A protein has these predicted regions:
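Outer membrane beta-barrel
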Residues: 1-134, 139-178
Length: 178
């Protein structure tokens, strides 16, 4: 589904440069009985130092159109934190995310519930996660032993009649317990 290569120039012993795949992803996604969604995505490329093989990115099941919330999702997926982290890199303007993004939790295992209100002008998501992405480092320490609560609320207080111009405001929080 997605393939991206890069030409890094770095010194690793006798190798001064090389070619590597930044991402080589294959995924499947769908809906069963109109109210059960699923996605499984595997990245075959080496993603970070210390990771010699691929890894799962998204593996989840979601229940749609629930009584008090729009959606409940369980599995391994991105925590609802930061407008810059959530969108796919396919929709990014720049090649890299900003430096501040290194402090954002990424893919972890958890459960979220979300709801849109006021004609989809207000949206909130709340979730509990088990830290599994070894953030902030890729060493073999006990950093992956904690749990976290993450929430995000976004709103569109003003929207032009053409629908293309609007003001988007949002806030998110994250509390980790190592």
């Amino acid at each position: 589904e997605r393939l991206a290569a890069l030409y890094p120039e770095y010194g690793l012993g006798k190798e001064d440069d090389g070619v590597a795949f930044r991402r080589a992803r294959l995924s499947i996604r769908g809906t069963i009985y109109e109210n059960i969604g699923f996605k499984a995505q595997y990245d075959f490329a080496v993603d970070s130092p210390g990771n010699d093989g691929g890894q799962f990115r998204d593996v989840y099941i979601e229940l749609l159109e629930l009584p008090f919330v729009d959606k409940a999702r369980i599995g391994h997926f991105q925590e609802p934190f930061s407008l810059e982290e959530i969108p796919s890199n396919s929709y990014m303007t720049f090649m890299e995310r900003s430096l501040a993004n290194v402090f954002v939790p990424s893919f972890n295992t958890g459960l979220t519930v979300e709801k849109s209100m006021l004609s989809k002008r207000l949206h909130w998501t709340l979730g509990i996660f088990k830290t599994t992405d070894f953030w902030p480092s890729d060493n073999d320490s006990n950093e992956a032993a904690g749990y976290g609560v993450t929430g995000r609320i976004t709103g569109v207080p003003w929207k032009a009649e053409d629908g293309d111009t609007f003001v988007h405001l949002g806030a998110s929080f994250n509390r980790r317990n190592p």
